[in-house]
């Protein structure tokens, strides 16, 4: 055995290295303390303290090296086979990388744990407890307590075998400790960069395929083929025990991820995972030159396939069970026969065969039969039955003819048939009637006023009184016309009509045809919409307008006469006798026409009937108009001019006239006063 200081170093060196590791970032110190705590748990002092504290170790929480090396293979296969579990497997790989860090540093911290004093072990245990409190937040307390007991039992036996192999591992751990110190310093500088690259790193880790991992393992095997020594029995036993625990830890992580459904990674965990990734990459590059490290690692990888293949076979069904829970399997596809195999729902009645009553075949509903006694009616309908739709000019009297109750048709009334059509008023001629009479032997027989004659050519004709109608036979389409007999509120079928008969008048000379044409003519003739009436009298409005026109003409004529007479008087006073005065008829006839009054006529009238003129002057007739007053003034004026008796007689007459006028005016005024007094 070599010198202990050469193998393990002095205590000063170990304390200096511990200070360097403590001065690192919180994430690095947590990782180193977790790694040293996981290896120190193999010692007896650690076992005693763990028994006193009752807290789970880092191995119980994170597993061993073999778990971390084997888990990527399983997670890679799961990623390749089932893409639906990418999120849960990405979280598994993240936890695997976190576990790789303490596995790479296990051997280094183990040598320091044996050489340090009990005080140092106490400090490391305190750090381990802090690290466990940080990292154990992802696991439930129930899982930690249950798994702690099972892992303690396993690792108690394994740690005893590991103690004998510590001497051999210490030599290999010296070189790794030196590289670890440099790695820690580099990790502090790259911690910030790794936080930024976290999202891309997680995706890259989740998408690693099995081929990439196999290539990496083959390259490492090629590098370590020349320097590979034979592995010790203790290492193989430790690897086997690691392989046994690996599926358990991976199952625990899967259960945790499935329970969480959406894994939530804290900032501290992300920093741990990024730092551990960096350490893995740099430790692998350092191990390329370090042959002894690679030898131990490759021996473990060579020993894994035999056991890990068995474990992978057992783990694949578990993953498949997870996907089966999410998406279902081929057995869940329902077929047409599944409904028969389904168990009956609780509370549903079940028959003797075990089938629900709803699925039983529906029994035919029995017919309801009601027994009713109806008298049987036998009718002798003859050999042939015909369906007849009577035309407008034919009618049938169903009751037998009786002269006592016979009512003739009235001209004023309208005959309507059963369908509401207006019948032609043919009176007795076109109505089919029948009656009962006795023959010569005294037997009652039926007699009718109509008969059907069948001719030799097969045609038929109906003779009704003196009228003859042609009968046409035609088949009926479909069995839709039946003969029924009314039985109370029901109908009893008797026969089915197969043929129908139609009737038409035989000739246009028959009375029936003439009445039909007349009725049609009356129906189709257009009534005169506008009637012109003769004027019985004259229009009063027209008469009124004519009277107004005549009155206007009379007024114009009177105005012309007055104007002419005024001019004549003025001329007479100035010149005396003139031609117009001496011969007035010549000018009057030309200018005034028939209505004008000549001076000669006035003279003759004055000479012939002075009294009449006076009576008219003194008359109070209201019918005399203004023209008569004017004419009277003219007469007076001319009388004065033509009077040869003198002015005395004229004055006398004027006074008489004035007196008469005054008396008349007084009478009128007295009447008005009386009316006002009333």
Curated annotation (Swiss-Prot):
Component of the PAF1 complex (PAF1C) which has multiple functions during transcription by RNA polymerase II and is implicated in regulation of development and maintenance of embryonic stem cell pluripotency. PAF1C associates with RNA polymerase II through interaction with POLR2A CTD non-phosphorylated and 'Ser-2'- and 'Ser-5'-phosphorylated forms and is involved in transcriptional elongation, acting both independently and synergistically with TCEA1 and in cooperation with the DSIF complex and HTATSF1. PAF1C is required for transcription of Hox and Wnt target genes. The modification Phosphotyrosine is found at residue 618. The modification Phosphoserine is found at residues 10, 14, 66, 161, 164, 173, 182, 190, 209, 217, 224, 232, 241, 250, 258, 266, 289, 291, 306, 308, 312, 619-620, 622, 626, 642, 670. Component of the PAF1 complex, which consists of CDC73, PAF1, LEO1, CTR9, RTF1 and SKIC8. The PAF1 complex interacts with PHF5A. Interacts with TCEA1, SUPT5H and CTNNB1. Interacts with SETD5. The modification N-acetylalanine is found at residue 2. One of its GO terms (biological process) is transcription elongation by RNA polymerase II. It comes from the Eukaryota. The keyword Lipoprotein does not apply. The keyword Manganese does not apply. Residues 32-43, 328-337 have a biased composition (Low complexity). Pfam families: Leo1. InterPro entries: Leo1 (IPR007149). This is RNA polymerase-associated protein LEO1. Residues 1-373, 559-596, 613-678 are annotated as: Disordered. Residues 1-14, 115-128, 164-178, 191-204, 586-595 have a biased composition (Acidic residues).
């Amino acid at each position: 055995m070599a010198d202990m200081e050469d193998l393990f170093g002095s205590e000063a060196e170990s304390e200096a290295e511990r200070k360097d590791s403590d001065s690192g970032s919180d994430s690095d110190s947590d990782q180193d303390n977790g790694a040293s705590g996981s290896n120190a748990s193999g010692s007896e002092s650690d076992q005693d303290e763990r028994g006193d504290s009752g807290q789970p170790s880092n191995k119980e929480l994170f597993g061993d090296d073999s778990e971390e090396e084997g888990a990527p293979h399983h997670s890679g296969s799961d990623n390749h086979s089932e893409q639906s579990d990418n999120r849960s497997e990405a979280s598994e790989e993240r936890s695997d990388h976190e576990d790789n860090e303490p596995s790479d540093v296990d051997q280094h911290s183990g040598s320091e744990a044996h050489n340090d004093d009990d005080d140092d072990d106490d400090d490391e245990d305190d750090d381990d407890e802090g690290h466990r409190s940080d990292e154990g937040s992802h696991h439930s307390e129930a899982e930690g307590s249950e798994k702690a007991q099972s892992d303690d039992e396993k690792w108690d036996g394994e740690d005893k075998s590991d103690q004998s192999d510590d001497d051999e591992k210490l030599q290999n751990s010296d070189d790794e400790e030196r590289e670890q110190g440099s790695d820690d310093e580099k990790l502090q500088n790259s911690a910030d960069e790794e936080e930024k690259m976290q999202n891309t790193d997680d995706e890259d880790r989740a998408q690693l395929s099995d081929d990439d991992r196999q290539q990496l393992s083959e390259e490492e095997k090629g590098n370590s083929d020349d320097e590979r020594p034979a592995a010790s029995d203790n290492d193989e036993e430790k690897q086997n025990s690691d392989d046994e625990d690996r599926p358990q830890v991976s199952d625990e992580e899967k259960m945790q991820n499935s329970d969480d459904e959406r894994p939530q990674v804290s900032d501290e965990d992300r920093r741990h995972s990024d730092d551990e990734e960096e350490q893995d990459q740099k430790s692998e590059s350092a191990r390329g030159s370090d042959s002894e490290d690679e030898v131990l690692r490759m021996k473990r990888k060579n020993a894994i396939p035999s056991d890990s293949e068995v474990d992978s076979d057992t783990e694949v069904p578990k993953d498949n069970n997870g996907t089966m829970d999410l998406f279902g399997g081929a057995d869940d596809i329902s077929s047409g026969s599944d409904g028969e195999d389904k168990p009956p729902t609780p509370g549903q009645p079940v028959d003797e065969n075990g089938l629900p009553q709803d699925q039983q075949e529906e029994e035919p509903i029995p017919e309801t039969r009601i027994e009713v006694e109806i008298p049987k009616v036998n009718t002798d309908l003859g050999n042939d039955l015909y369906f007849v739709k009577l035309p407008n000019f034919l009618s049938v009297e169903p009751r037998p003819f009786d002269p006592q109750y016979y009512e003739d048709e009235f001209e004023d009334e309208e005959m309507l048939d059963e369908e509401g059509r207006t019948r032609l008023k043919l009176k007795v001629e076109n109505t089919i009637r029948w009656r009962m009479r006795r023959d010569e032997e005294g037997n009652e027989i039926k007699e009718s006023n109509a008969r059907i004659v069948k001719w030799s050519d097969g045609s038929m004709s109906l003779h009704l009184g003196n009228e003859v109608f042609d009968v046409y036979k035609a088949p009926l389409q479909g069995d839709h016309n039946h003969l029924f007999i009314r039985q109370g509120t029901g109908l009893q079928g008797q026969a089915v009509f197969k043929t129908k008969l139609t009737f038409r008048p035989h000739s246009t000379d028959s009375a029936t045809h003439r009445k039909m044409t007349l009725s049609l003519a009356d129906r189709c003739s257009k009534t005169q919409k506008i009637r012109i009436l003769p004027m019985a009298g004259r229009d009063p409005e027209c008469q009124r307008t004519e009277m107004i026109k005549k009155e206007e003409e009379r007024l114009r004529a009177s105005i012309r006469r007055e104007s002419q007479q005024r001019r004549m008087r003025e001329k007479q006073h100035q010149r005396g006798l003139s031609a117009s005065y001496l011969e007035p008829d010549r000018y009057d006839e030309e200018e005034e026409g028939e209505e004008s009054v000549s001076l000669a006529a006035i003279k003759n009238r004055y000479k012939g009937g002075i009294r009449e003129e006076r009576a008219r002057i003194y008359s109070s007739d209201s019918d005399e108009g203004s023209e008569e007053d004017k004419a009277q003034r003219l007469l007076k004026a001319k009388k004065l001019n033509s009077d040869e008796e003198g002015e005395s007689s004229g004055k006398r007459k004027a006074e008489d006239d004035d007196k008469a006028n005054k008396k008349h005016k007084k009478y009128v005024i007295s009447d008005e006063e009386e009316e006002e007094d009333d």
